[in-house]
Swiss-Prot record:
GO terms for biological process: electron transport chain; ferredoxin metabolic process. Its cofactor is [2Fe-2S] cluster. Binds 1 [2Fe-2S] cluster. It is found in: Plastid, Chloroplast. GO terms for cellular component: chloroplast stroma. This is Ferredoxin-1. Disulfide bonds: none annotated. Residues 3-93 form the 2Fe-2S ferredoxin-type domain. It comes from the Eukaryota. Keywords: 2Fe-2S, Chloroplast, Electron transport, Iron, Iron-sulfur, Metal-binding, Plastid, Transport. NCBIfam families: fdx_plant (TIGR02008). Signal peptide: none annotated. One of its GO terms (molecular function) is metal ion binding.
Length: 97
């Protein structure tokens, strides 16, 4: 399946379609959108965003704890869309406090 991903960035919102077997960060880059990242392996917080609508599968990541995931935080480098989804990007500071 392919879902519509909306990223709310500091420069404004962008939308693109993302297959459910492609990481959101990878697809965003394919579409020409620059997002923050570092490890690309789900083990840091550089790419952190916050899901405001929809659901993702980020089971490949290991940096976020259950409370952070429950609060809606997402690592875009290891997140597959499971529905149409809206994510606020550039949330590393909110995550790390």
């Amino acid at each position: 399946a392919t879902y519509k991903v909306k990223l709310v960035t500091p420069d404004g919102p962008v939308e693109f379609n993302c297959p459910d077997d492609v990481y959101i960060l990878d697809q965003a880059e394919e579409e020409g959108h620059e997002l923050p990242y570092s490890c690309r392996a789900g083990s840091c917080s550089s790419c952190a965003g916050k899901v405001s609508a929809g659901t993702v599968d980020q089971s490949d990541g290991n940096f976020l704890d259950d409370d952070q995931i429950a609060d809606g935080f997402v690592l875009t480098c290891v997140a597959y869309p499971q529905s149409d989804v809206t994510i606020e990007t550039h949330k590393e500071e909110d995550l790390t406090g």
